[in-house]
Amino acid sequence: MNGNKDSGSNKELAATFTPAEIENRLYKKWEDAGYFKADSKSKKPPFTIVIPPPNVTGSLHIGHALDHTIQDLLTRMKRMKGFEALWLPGMDHAGIATQNVVEKQLAAVGKTRHDLGREAFIQKVWQWKEESGGVILDQMRRLGDSVDWDREAFTMDANLSKAVLTIFKRLYEKELIYRAERIINWCPRCLTAISDIEVDHKDDSGEFVSIKYGDDDVNITIATTRAETMLGDGAVAVNPNDERYKHLVGKKVLLPLVDRMIPIIADELVDPDFGTGAVKVTAAHDANDFEMGMRHGVELVIIMNEHGVMEGTGTKFDGMDRFDARKAVVEELRKLGRVVSEKRPYVHAVGHCQRCETTIEPRLSKQWFVKVAPLAKAAADAVRDGRVKIEPEEMSPRYFEWVDNMHDWCISRQLWWGHRIPVFYGPNGEVIVCGPDEQAPAGYTQDPDVLDTWFSSALWPFSTLGWPADTDDLKKFYPTSVLVTGYDILFFWVVRMMMMGLFAMDGKQPFNVIALHGLVRDQFGKKMSKSRGNTVDPIEFMDKYGSDALRFTLARGANPGTDQALAEDWIAGSRNFATKLWNATRFAKLNGATVEGELAKRSDLNAIDNWILTRLDQVIASADELFEKFEFAKACELIYHFTWDDLCDWYLELSKATFAGDDAAKSQRVLGEVLDQVLRLMHPVMPFITEELWCNLTGKESLMITDWPKSDLSSQDQESVELVNMMQEIVTEVRRFRNDQGIKSTAKISAKFIGLDKVGLSDYEPSLRHILKCEDKSANFTAKTQIGQVIVEFDLTGAIDLVAERSRLTKDLEAAKKDRDTAKVKLDNEGFMAKAPMDVVSEIRLRLTQTSEDIERLTALLEKLPK
């Protein structure tokens, strides 16, 4: 890319890598230089990601850290590939969560929102948002997010509010929004309907009670965990194929306590094997019962108010809390002899409000709904016909399972903070919907409810680009390129964006690819939760190990759609990797590595240089392909092992003799080239350390505005690869020999290499001697080892105590033979074999194999010792 001029920063690197010293400085440098900004007028091809907007109340958790690492990785890579890359940031107003925060502040001074009134309360929330909200935005900077801050959006911004009003009116005019009584999730504490995603299902130890309905003429026994709701029963249901109850279908039965006659109906929904096979139908207080009740015309009897208190039953239970009423109803039924079977423990999942942990009450309520059938079909078709691709593909069935079976979406919330529903009611029952810049006639009152937070966030991919106006941003950056998010909100958010995007944008999908990642779990694979005490704070990890270490750890564990475990030791390991890279660059600079000038022709380079360049091309090609396929874990693993193993452990060590010699220039240029390309390749994952090292190595302005590395697989040098492979075999065998002989790895010994000429390695004896710390000072070579055609002889004089070593090996050999013989005797004993358990026999056989191998190894070591 153009514009990456020499910045004159090519100075000596510090001896140690200290993340805290570089991260804030580099992020400010990038932001001040405008590197994150995207230009809608650019001729470059677009690449767009809109950030899943975190709640304004939130702070960075480990799931965010993974999500943002992947998005930043893709954005930085595409920017380096020449795309006009836009990563658009923002926050969600988080209706119920934010309202709860401010209400708690008011409660602390003895006030409620009703004391302030609606307008004053909303102003109070805005004030809180400006003063305390958005903590996560500063934490995003800590992580290194290269977002276009000039485009930061908020779901309550004026233009996004305009988008909400526009699409609400369009949906209403298409008869895709309607008002009706339905069963919804109701929080008796927050006093609002809440979405499915705001309901946490927890196992609850309830109690099954079997109750006899009816009299001597007609009676039937039902089983329930919610005895209090029987006061609102409208029917009893059985399966039509259940022979036990066929004769009762169509008859009426007496409902105890309220003395109301209710019908016995037959419905396929009833499981004849569950409980007694007969269920009570409380159509106003259970979602399944409501659907069944609609099919059979069952009476809707409301027995509870919005606070979860019994009301309107005409019994002594009115005024009781629902849970107190449950106990009281069972006790009264027992007195009447109606309890057929006493309480039986029953564990089942019960919904709780995510915000306040109150048990959710299914409630019949008049709410606003989106008719999802045509919208969901369009969302399904977009994936089925290939316009939108889901990664990994095996997640597609889960997507279709949801969109093909969606219920209408309840979008109204009984809150004050949020987008107020733009519906107005006239004095004579008129209903009108006002779009942006429209006002209701005098005398009309607006619906008091606000829209579900997910309604406005469903518009995020296009509302943030200026819709409903036909903006340059919308033309350039929509559809967005990829949506990166966890599979856990595939239904709640992703599907809703698909539906709204396709509807608003005339069939244009909101994104081309849905890239789903898994959840971050603890090191044992358990889900993180405050109750388990296994949550982790990414900020603490960044403070301790640096942002790059956390990012690399998360990316290295990110397999598409698969959960990953996280342990602090692994982040420490990534910090060690960063330190390894830092030290390698420092070594390179101290040894004259350069990026100036052309590389020598491959034919003029030695085998070690050709090998590392060949490996570099292979790694660049493979890593690039893996990144594009969202195989981040595999790409990071590949880069890690190339950098640590091939570059640092092999190339640098094998080349030290060359760097110290008179013919170092070509190798210095090769080392500079390899580091240059590796730092580019790693930059999207570890942006801070790579920027610092690359600028120091090259003296140029920024790695962010340079080109992505390209591979040249046509220059592969297989002969050099084979030569270096042979060197690696020699080094590995000699190191093993030294270890077997108890010779310290740092100790120098005399050695003689025989046969290097036969395998083309004569010129590389200095490199082998350097890496193996082998001198050529002796003629008393008394021990040897062989690798193919190459023999290495050693003078062990002074290196080890030969008498003590021979004694140790002989003692170990005798012990191994004794163990072997003992195992053989047992295995040859037919009586023992007939009675011994299989696991014992297997263990003895394994011991025989191991001792036989030990005998072979120890015998060989003794033979190699000088006589």
PLM feature spans:
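Residue patterns forming the tRNA-binding/recognition surfaces of aminoacyl-tRNA synthetases
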Residues: 2-5, 11, 16, 25, ...
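Feature 926 captures the class I aminoacyl-tRNA synthetase adenylation module centered on the KMSKS loop
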Residues: 3, 210, 401-455, 459, ...
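Amphipathic alpha-helical blocks
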Residues: 21-39, 241-242
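N-terminal catalytic cores of NTP/NDP-binding nucleotidyl/phosphoryl-transfer enzymes
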Residues: 39-102, 164, 223-225, 229, ...
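Short, solvent-exposed turn/loop segments enriched in Gly/Ser/Thr/Pro and often Arg
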Residues: 42-44, 52-53, 86-99, 152-160, ...
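Secondary-structure transition/capping motifs at alpha-helix termini
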Residues: 76-84, 105-118, 138, 142-147, ...
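Catalytic alpha/beta core of large soluble enzyme barrels
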Residues: 84, 227-307, 330, 334, ...
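Active-site-adjacent "gating/activation" loops or surface patches in catalytic cores
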Residues: 260-265, 448-478, 645, 649-652
